[in-house]
Amino acid sequence: MRYRLFVRLNCHLCADAFALLCEMGVEVQRINIDRDPALRAQYDVLVPVLFDAERDRELLYPFDAEDVRRFMAQG
């Protein structure tokens, strides 16, 4: 899957970000950073983070629908 959302359990901002992406129709895989020590070290206080695996880019929270659209449109 192209887009990944780095999250952690019981994170209300992560839930908000996922809900926004779902409302926009963005197919995204949620990845719990607490299951991977390397991801936890990289994203510990940054979650939620939207990651584009094809372009190796990140969109840090806070973001809104317009930010996501711009992020997805950038080449």
Regions found by a protein language model. Name each.
Residues 6, 31, 60:
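Small/polar loops that bind or transfer phosphate-bearing groups
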Residues 26-37, 44:
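Thiol-based oxidoreductase modules, predominantly thioredoxin-like and allied folds used
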Residues 44-51:
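Structural micro-motif
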Residues 1-24:
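Local sequence-structure signature of Cys/Sec-based thiol-disulfide redox active-site neighborhoods
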Residues 16-19, 41-42, 63:
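Generic recognition of short, well-ordered alpha-helical segments
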Residues 54-75:
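Non-catalytic, surface beta->alpha helical segment in thiol-disulfide oxidoreductase systems
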